[in-house]
Amino acid sequence: MMTVPFSQPEKHSMTTMKAVGFNRPLPASDENCLLDIELPAPEPKPHDLLVEVRAVSVNPADVKVRAVHTPAEGKYRVLGWDAAGVVKAVGSEVRGFKAGDEVYYAGAINRQGSYAQLQAVDSRIAAKKPRTLDFAQAAALPLTALTAWETLFDRLDVNKPVAGDSRALLLVGGAGGVGSITVQLLKTLTDIQIIATASRPESEAWLRRLGADFVINHHHSLPEQVEKLGIGTPSWAFSTSHTEHYLPQLAELLAPQGRIALIDDPAALDANPLKGKSISLHWEFMFTRPLRETADIARQGEILAKVAQLVDEGRLHSTVTQTINGINAANLRRAHQMVERGDMVGKVVLAGW
């Protein structure tokens, strides 16, 4: 393996570590799209934890960045925005953590990721992992749990009713990582009826096990299917993919003054159909708080702590559906291919070095 510098300027010790990185955008089918490399170990900044990574999960964000990002010449980008591991050292401003703590986190998109034996992560966006989960089970949760929580409670504000309409939420693309935890949070923390979409029998069965009240097919007319349910007009909609296709249907079926959230990246989006009903549109980008270092950056650590509590109480469950032993380039390429196909149910996790 070759030793190369980080793509982000950080202070390093002389210790090296195994990592998986890339130096040019390539398709997941190319054996050089991800490479086993060796890097200097990061040194924690004042607010940082230095974590020995035990397990990671792969998300659509990893696939998107790998496919389009070109690191600076001679440098490698390390992906990975889900991890669970053990704290090895803490920065001078860290409170509430110590060496030996078992933690989980998503991290920040503007820093090196978790495909490495050691990772420096801001302690304010991390939490102690659920005690009842192993590292692999815990690593499946952070990014999707944060995305789902922020969407439901910060963007859609589901605790604030839409006057005169059904307390129902339509979740487009329910069986993936984000959808799987969204269903659980709604079922556990609200009395909202959950309408989730799926197109395959295994996806429908998965959603019903998680707690969806109704499952409809996103390949057919959403307004017609929702009307046939006989539960009234939904107040909220959460679109996880292909929003440019579904937005006109969501505008038709949603209640006046309803709210729509999305997390994908449509090339163009015509929001004019929303005006006649005063429907609001909200983007959720989980990395906003750490990327912009917002005043409430610590809310992410608080959310993950609450999620861990709910897991340990048996009220939330890990969404891992496949675990691959060994964090290395070959296995990560395989996981990227699985995510790229777009038919994942739950999450794929890699554990151990």
What residues fall within each predicted segment?
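C-terminal capping/lid region of NAD(P)-dependent oxidoreductase domains
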Residues: 12-15, 315-322, 333-353
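Short, glycine/polar-rich helix-capping loops at beta-to-alpha or helix-loop-helix junctions
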Residues: 114-115, 198-206, 268-271
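Mid-domain Rossmann-like dinucleotide-binding core that forms the NAD(H)/NADP(H) cofactor-binding site
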Residues: 141-220
